[in-house]
Amino acid sequence: MGGFCGADRGGFLALLVWLQLLQPLFSGTYKPREDSGVMHRPQRPRRPRSDPEAPAQQSRLKSLSISHPSGVPVSVDRTEIPGSGSPSGTTTKITLENRRSSLGGPFFTDTCGHRITEVDPGSLSAGRKWPWQVSLQSQNEHVCGGSLISHRWVLTAAHCIYEQEEYMVMLGDDMLHSESESVTLVPVQDIIFPSNFDIQTMRNDIALALLYFPVNYSSLIQPVCLPEEPFRVKNGTVCWVTGWGQQNEIDAGFASILLQEVQQRILLQKHCNTLFQRQLGTSKNLVIKGMICGLQDSGQSLCWGDSGNPLVCESDNTWTQVGIMSWGINCNGVPVLSVYTDIAEYNEWVSYVLSQASRMDPMGVLVLYLSLVFPLALLVAL
């Protein structure tokens, strides 16, 4: 009967000891450290509000049927959807239910939302004016935008993610397909989104992408702040959205090479719905709870390929992401209306996802497995 020789047993035991010693180093990736957790702008304590869509337990998906929009008079960037209609096997759903979670301590810091090198407002985005901006890519092509919120997490739109696709995240450069040494490419390990995301109405259009390994912050790569409840951006506030989407409807399928920026004026839902109804000849309210609306009067707008991009507002020299680009109509129209996922509505969900991830310990699971398997192997050898 074959077995392990003495040298083999010694090697196995040595490997097990090394894995146990290295476990804190590897497992530290997920711990909510001050420099690795999602970052929120500090807010004065306020009375919590009742949130009908706080998160619950997560579960692994094998398939989830999501059909393309039908009968909804909005543009949903079909040209950038790479899949056939259901999330991949590496996609996790998290149900939004009437439950709240608390996440405090190191996750809430004030080191986010800052530029290392300032650039004049209104110029093209050279020089990493927006260091949290990332490109979500598939098969070396830009699919959607996103924003870095921690060393290992990227925020984007749920409708960008479809099955049988391997995703990469590009950070550190404003040029797509740049060969600069500043470019960082990181594969995506997992993508998490609300189980009740509805592509018909674009409700709950938010997703979190987990990078395979953490990225280091620099003058080219910085996280953006997220709003804390009950933060609400005021009507008329001037904010900015950035992205590599095509610049007009004529250039279908061609992303901009250089990162673009567009100024947005925040509109109340009621006013936004009135403008949509007037343009589309409908009585339906298309902008619903969980969405915010931006207006650009000049005709410069976002277009296909801009989904998932961050809408950011500045206050006290700190940039906070208030929205995720979700949908809009008529790239070349005036005025241009764009609709964003309201991040403040999903603050608890984001915090819950990251708090659950912080409890994961893949290296610990491996050590446990080896601790069980190796003694059995040694017994067999003996």
Swiss-Prot record:
CDD domains: Tryp_SPc. SMART domains: Tryp_SPc (SM00020). InterPro entries: Peptidase_S1_PA (IPR009003), Peptidase_S1_PA_chymotrypsin (IPR043504), Peptidase_S1A (IPR001314), Trypsin_dom (IPR001254), TRYPSIN_HIS (IPR018114). It is a lipid-anchor; GPI-anchor. SUPFAM superfamilies: Trypsin-like serine proteases. Residues 1-27 form the signal peptide. The keyword Membrane applies. The chain crosses the membrane at residues 362-382. It is found in: Cell membrane. This is Serine protease 43.
